[in-house]
UniProtKB/Swiss-Prot annotation:
Transmembrane segments: none annotated. Residues 32-186 form the C-CAP/cofactor C-like domain. The keyword Membrane applies. Keywords: Cell membrane, GTP-binding, GTPase activation, Lipoprotein, Membrane, Myristate, Nucleotide-binding, Palmitate. SMART domains: CARP. This is Protein XRP2. Belongs to the TBCC family. A lipid is attached at residue 3 (S-palmitoyl cysteine). Residues 1-39 are annotated as: Disordered. The lineage of its organism: Eukaryota, Metazoa, Chordata, Craniata, Vertebrata. One of its GO terms (molecular function) is GTP binding. PROSITE patterns: C_CAP_COFACTOR_C (PS51329), NDPK_LIKE (PS51374). A lipid is attached at residue 2 (N-myristoyl glycine). The keyword Coiled coil does not apply.
């Protein structure tokens, strides 16, 4: 294979060779400038916490800005990443309290033990971990491997920049499979994971940051303020009556869904699960059945947001609330207790297949 050579430039008049830093003479072309030449240099140290002990450290909003982050060999530390990132790896950490803002890709815990965490991500995985307690928002099914004593709860957190960080990370606040754990290495007769108590207090696990710098982030762990709706997930339902409500894409879809959640939970009903997903006409036929023709034209606007509520009288309560609060807005709501369970199954079976593609 040959080599490419360029001719050596002749010395300028007067015997001086032209320096590389001089401007090109008239008529000569400038060397092309590429975007990657002008990109700011990334210092890995700015995106790494390594070898720390008994420290409180973190990154403020805007300081990570979608980069990869590494946490390793930390002991008895409180770590707060108040920003979105691409991926996060956490290796060989012991007795740490960790908050991780929205992660566009995966978070991977390896060989960690006795850590308490709050995490939002696209993919969650652990390997060779023991006794992790995690308040989780995960868009796909979380996976544990060779890990024991794992406990999970629903992500519950707020600070003013968090909603935009979820958007920047490409995560929907309605897609959270926090309790649907897949154990890659199950042991016969044992259960390597379980759920945190339903009344678990987030700050008892991951306290608010104590350092003056990190206190500037206005954090709340109040369930009513949480960016992620608090769902029951796979906890046992209190009633055999559920109801499906589906909002269609529009300017106020998220706000309307949050409003219905507030109204229904305020009346004592429980939010079991939520989902945001795109639908086609044939999907609507299967899910909405005889009502499909009414909703198919709305599917072109974008993804739908579905909510499952549970509790005695959930269908009547949801229909009355939608009529009172969202009059004039097209919303699918189960028609009766008899049809509601099938509505829920039809939608979430479709959604699980769609998300798995």
């Amino acid at each position: 294979m040959g080599c490419f050579f360029s001719k050596r430039r002749k010395p300028a008049q007067g015997g001086q060779q032209q320096g590389a830093s001089q401007e090109p003479a008239a008529g000569e072309e400038k060397a092309p400038q590429y975007s990657w030449d002008q990109r700011a240099k990334v210092d890995p140290k700015d995106y790494t916490f390594s070898g720390l002990k008994d420290e409180t450290v973190g990154r403020l909003p805007g300081r990570v800005a979608g980069q990869q982050f590494v946490i390793q060999d930390c002991e008895n530390c409180s770590i707060y990443i108040f920003d979105h990132s691409a991926t996060v790896t956490i290796d060989d950490c012991v007795n740490c309290q960790i908050f991780l803002g929205p992660i566009k890709g995966s978070v991977f815990f390896r060989n960690c033990k006795d850590c308490k965490c709050i995490v939002a991500c696209q993919q969650f995985r652990t390997r060779d971990c023991r006794r992790l307690e995690v308040f989780l928002c995960c868009a796909t099914q979380p996976i544990i491997e060779s890990s024991t004593g794992m406990k999970f709860g629903c992500f519950q957190y707020y600070y003013p920049e968090l909603a935009l960080q979820f958007k920047d990370a490409g995560l929907s606040i309605f897609n959270n499979t926090w309790s649907n754990i897949h154990d890659f290495t199950p042991v016969s007769g044992e259960n390597n994971w379980g759920l945190l108590p339903e009344n678990a207090v987030v700050q008892d696990y991951v306290p608010l940051p104590a350092s003056e710098e990190l206190k500037a982030v206005r954090v709340s762990t109040d369930a009513m303020k949480s960016i992620i709706p608090i769902t029951r997930g796979q906890r046992q339902k209190n009633s055999d009556e559920s109801c499906l409500a589906v909002f269609f894409a529009g300017d106020y879809t998220t706000a309307n869904a949050r409003k219905l959640i507030d109204e229904m939970t305020g009346k004592g009903f429980q939010l079991v699960q939520t989902k945001e997903v795109s639908m086609k006409a044939e999907d609507a036929q299967r899910v909405f059945q005889q009502c499909a023709s009414e909703f198919i034209p709305l599917l072109e606007r974008g993804p739908v947001v579905a909510l499952e509520f549970n509790g005695d009288g959930a269908v009547e309560g949801c229909r009355n609330t939608v009529n009172d609060v969202f009059n004039g807005t097209k919303v699918f709501v189960s028609e009766s207790k008899a049809s509601a369970s099938q509505d829920v199954d039809n939608f979430y079976n479709f959604a699980d297949m769609q998300m798995g593609m």
